[in-house]
């Protein structure tokens, strides 16, 4: 009789632990942020100029003497007033009704008497379909975030992006913003509403065990896709 040699208990437990850890690591599907551009930018170093020996220095890296505080260079900051309120409603309905009736008789030969003297045939059918559907969505997002000018387009528009992180209890909250700002829409308080930003991307996400508990695992997604009910 051939003897089967089993692995020692310790290696078996180690292999099982590694398998469970691998499945646990695959339970959460990583989500890529919708904003892929850099969140900040460093302003270029100004060219060194010889000091003129007066109070006004044209080579000063700050603002000129007669210029407002609106951003216009890479590295300048801007406050975004997030005021998004989107409502959408959709409804649809369909109703169809169709009926049909057919009746005809087939005479037979005379020598076929009894039940076969005359054959009658009739057919009737009806088809009815009624369906209704509706959907509604409402999203509101209010807040403020300060972003950095990461690029200046040839027409003068500013490409901005920024990120705000907040660690609250056991969760890390992220607010990311990016878009293209027209300098003419910037107020004197160095702020602009998000509704006036082109190509705006606003992302609010979190990391932590609460977010992981609210995320469906990959195995659940698999059975959800193949389940016929």
Swiss-Prot record:
<dbReference type="GO" id="GO:0071973">
    <property type="term" value="P:bacterial-type flagellum-dependent cell motility"/>
</dbReference>
<dbReference type="GO" id="GO:0009279">
    <property type="term" value="C:cell outer membrane"/>
</dbReference>
<dbReference type="GO" id="GO:0009427">
    <property type="term" value="C:bacterial-type flagellum basal body, distal rod, L ring"/>
</dbReference>
<comment type="subunit">
    <text>The basal body constitutes a major portion of the flagellar organelle and consists of four rings (L,P,S, and M) mounted on a central rod.</text>
</comment>
<protein>
    <recommendedName>
        <fullName>Flagellar L-ring protein</fullName>
    </recommendedName>
</protein>
<comment type="function">
    <text>Assembles around the rod to form the L-ring and probably protects the motor/basal body from shearing forces during rotation.</text>
</comment>
<dbReference type="Pfam" id="PF02107">
    <property type="entry name" value="FlgH"/>
</dbReference>
<keyword id="KW-0564">Palmitate</keyword>
<keyword id="KW-0998">Cell outer membrane</keyword>
<keyword id="KW-0975">Bacterial flagellum</keyword>
<dbReference type="InterPro" id="IPR000527">
    <property type="entry name" value="Flag_Lring"/>
</dbReference>
<keyword id="KW-0472">Membrane</keyword>
<keyword id="KW-0732">Signal</keyword>
<feature type="lipid moiety-binding region" description="N-palmitoyl cysteine">
    <location>
        <position position="26"/>
    </location>
</feature>
<feature type="signal peptide">
    <location>
        <begin position="1"/>
        <end position="25"/>
    </location>
</feature>
<feature type="lipid moiety-binding region" description="S-diacylglycerol cysteine">
    <location>
        <position position="26"/>
    </location>
</feature>
<dbReference type="GO" id="GO:0003774">
    <property type="term" value="F:cytoskeletal motor activity"/>
</dbReference>
<comment type="similarity">
    <text>Belongs to the FlgH family.</text>
</comment>
<keyword id="KW-0449">Lipoprotein</keyword>
